[in-house]
Amino acid sequence: MRPASGVHNVQATMQVNWRGVFPAIVTQFRQDQSLDPDATAKHLETLIQAGIHGVVLLGTVGENTALEYGEKLALLKEMVPVVHGRVPVLTGVAEYTTALGCRFARDAEKIGIDGLMVLPAMVYKSDQRETIAHFRSVARATGLPVMVYNNPVSYSVDVTPEMFVELADEPALVAIKESSENVRRITDLVNLLGDRYILFCGVDDLVLESILLGAHGWISGLVNAFPEESRALWDLAASGCWEQARALYRWYTPLLHLDTRIKLVQYIKLAMAETGLGSEMVRAPRLPLVGAERQEVLGVIRHAIATRPAVGQTIVFRGLPTVERP
């Protein structure tokens, strides 16, 4: 482990191999808004077969805060055997108090989850001291490796690079999902902390920029609807095939913008329905899209489907040479 110059509180961390494309998987519901574990398991298997490198259950896109505590655990119990150790499985930890976050982390550990993606406590907007104390407490609650999810846009709490320096003495904190929409954060984190943390891009329409700057992985919402294209984009960029990566990214970006809007869950599930990979059913207070908004989003999705490149062992773009997959 290589800390940056001047950083003295870095400790040896747990060793994990978290790299590549990790979908923030949706939670599927029936028409009555009850959990549909069978449909969720089917979708999870589809993503694994498409070549994803890991999976995050019960994140923002997984509608974590719309599920009851027992429902979350029930879903984890159903999904862990589906994965059967083929890829790492993380769960979101998004609770209203630190104590409840610690409890959920311990319960998830008993189920056999591989790691935790921990958010700040919900609703209350903690200050820096409180936020650091929250992450320390949850990190010490289990023997699992932890990814810190920084999303000030959605949750109004910003975990700054300087705060990650302070947290660097917690060996369980191994990774960061950076969703501040400030791509400069990748470089700032590397400059301050070297390779202390595994860095994941958490903003779909910043992924190519983040890979160029040193991100090790991508936690994506749109991969739920376009898994093959997401894996191809990662492979091209990680292998330095920048011309082809740019071409794929330019096709994909109008879709990826959907991940950055307030109704991202509805947009992603609508894209899944259009690609035949799942239901658009969400749980209230979210409602399926209607009217002009629905037509606008469908226009983006359907144009992308009509113009999507052929992605397989070779990738075929309009107007560019065919390229072999790395």
Describe each PLM feature range.
Residues 1-11, 321-326:
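N-terminal amphipathic/basic-hydrophobic helices that include classical n-h-c signal peptides
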Residues 11-23, 28-156:
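Active-site beta->alpha loop and helix N-cap motifs at the rims of alpha/beta catalytic domains
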Residues 13-17, 188, 197, 272:
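Catalytic cores of TIM-barrel enzymes
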Residues 18, 40, 72, 76, ...:
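A general structural signal for well-ordered alpha-helical segments in protein cores
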Residues 37, 41-44, 161, 294-301:
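Short, amphipathic alpha-helical "lid/cap" segments that border enzyme active or binding sites
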Residues 50, 74, 78-83, 107, ...:
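Alpha-helical structural signal in soluble globular domains
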Residues 140, 152-262:
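Catalytic alpha/beta core domains of metabolic enzymes, predominantly
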Residues 208-321, 326:
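Structured C-terminal cap/extension of enzyme domains
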